[in-house]
């Protein structure tokens, strides 16, 4: 970033475009690419953000080199199997050797999306990486190894808990109350972002 006025971002697991809308509300930021595995999400995002390149894909099934290099990687990995809102007991990320019960494929895939963050960051070496998820992600058994993997790539991090309904720095706050965790990574040696302003 170092003084550049052209800050680019990629929005992964983009949904309808709320994160993109937030990013482009910051002067100098543009979202170059957005991706999701669901065609309806891509259709909606494309309608809302026509100047962004859209890629319909399951990130685990494609190579990161298909995406443009950007300053920021924004990831909103699937949170269904981390969240208590699901209404079912969360499944452990590790399979017990003493149990015949195996986690469902959907649960494993949901948690595996967190590792797409590491894989894409390793390839693109973003200046900043933001990961938005539910607060329960902190109790995921592989949370610490996941953080350690990002540290091994040369990033420092800070964990921020925020209900977006109470955040209105750049405009109207979100119209719903949902607690979220934002794990913010920056390259070690670079100045840490100012999270207080």
Task: Annotate each PLM feature.
Residues 9, 34, 74, 130-131:
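Generic enzyme active-site microenvironment
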Residues 1-31, 37, 41, 149-152, ...:
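S-adenosyl-L-methionine-dependent DNA methyltransferase catalytic core
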Residues 40-67:
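S-adenosyl-L-methionine
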Residues 62-72, 82-197:
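Class I S-adenosyl-L-methionine
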Residues 25-28, 48, 67, 123:
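Alpha-helix termination/capping residues and helix-transition junctions
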Residues 30-33, 53, 156-158:
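Conserved beta-strand segments of alpha/beta enzyme cores
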Residues 12, 37, 59, 133-134:
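Generic detector of well-ordered alpha-helical packing
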Residues 77-78:
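Short glycine-/small-residue-rich Rossmann-like dinucleotide-binding loops
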